Swiss-Prot record:
Protein family (similarity comment): Belongs to the RecX family.
Gene: recX
Pfam family, one: RecX_HTH1
Record carries keyword Cytoplasm: yes
Organism listed in the record: Mycolicibacterium vanbaalenii (strain DSM 7251 / JCM 13017 / BCRC 16820 / KCTC 9966 / NRRL B-24157 / PYR-1)
Function: Modulates RecA activity.
Protein name in the entry: Regulatory protein RecX
One annotated Gene Ontology cellular component of this protein: cytoplasm
Segments for region (Disordered): 1-21
Subcellular location as annotated: Cytoplasm
Gene3D superfamilies: Winged helix-like DNA-binding domain superfamily/Winged helix DNA-binding domain
InterPro entries reported in the protein's UniProt record: RecX_HTH_1st, RecX_HTH_2nd, Regulatory_RecX, WH-like_DNA-bd_sf
């Protein structure tokens, strides 16, 4: 059974070559998908990089989408869940990562819709708390040392895609809580 329609040509050697290239493209996509889930755009780029014609790439990707091996919506949801849990990424960073992987904006919005501001703030507080436990705070009257720690923590949250205003509020509150905890 052939997964790809044979091109209308009178030369059977050319038709065999097209079928062979289609099978090679399919094998490449399956090998890439074995390592991790990928977006359609990532697979298109991999096929283009290896010189597969657009019509063969489109046929292979359409078939993989049809059987459910390529699903950008599912990929985006899994990516958001994984990166929030393991890397502590905020909405902004997650959206940028998904855009870079070629996911459509509507799909990104749908994947990020499940994250509310309260959950994002809670995750930021947890990240700051974990980091503060390993920080040496020094003298509470030394404002320079306190500002240095605060800048470092706000920067950490900013790199993970958290809003700067929220990051500053979280860091200020968690610094005060940690100082209070260490007094006891």
């Amino acid at each position: 059974m052939t997964l790809f329609p044979l091109p209308s040509t009178s030369d059977p050697a050319e038709a065999d070559e097209s079928t062979k290239r289609g099978e090679q493209a399919r094998a490449l996509c399956l090998r890439l998908l074995t390592a991790r889930a990928r977006t359609r755009a990532e697979l298109e780029a991999a096929l283009a990089k290896r010189g597969y014609p657009d019509d063969i790439a489109a046929a292979v990707l359409d078939r993989l989408t049809q059987v459910g091996l390529v699903d950008d919506e599912d990929f985006a949801e899994q990516w958001v869940r994984s990166r929030r849990l393991n890397a502590g990424k905020g909405k902004r960073a997650l959206a940028a990562e998904l855009r870079k992987k070629g996911v459509d904006n509507e799909v990104i919005d749908g994947a990020l819709a499940g994250i509310d501001a309260g959950a994002e703030r809670t995750r930021a507080e947890q990240l700051v708390r974990d980091k503060l436990r390993r920080e040496k705070l020094g003298d509470p009257d030394d404002r320079d040392a306190e500002n240095k720690v605060a800048r470092r923590l706000v920067g950490m949250l900013a790199r993970r895609g958290y809003n700067q205003t929220m990051a500053f509020d979280v860091v200020t509150a968690e610094l005060a809580n940690e100082r209070e905890r260490r007094k006891v």
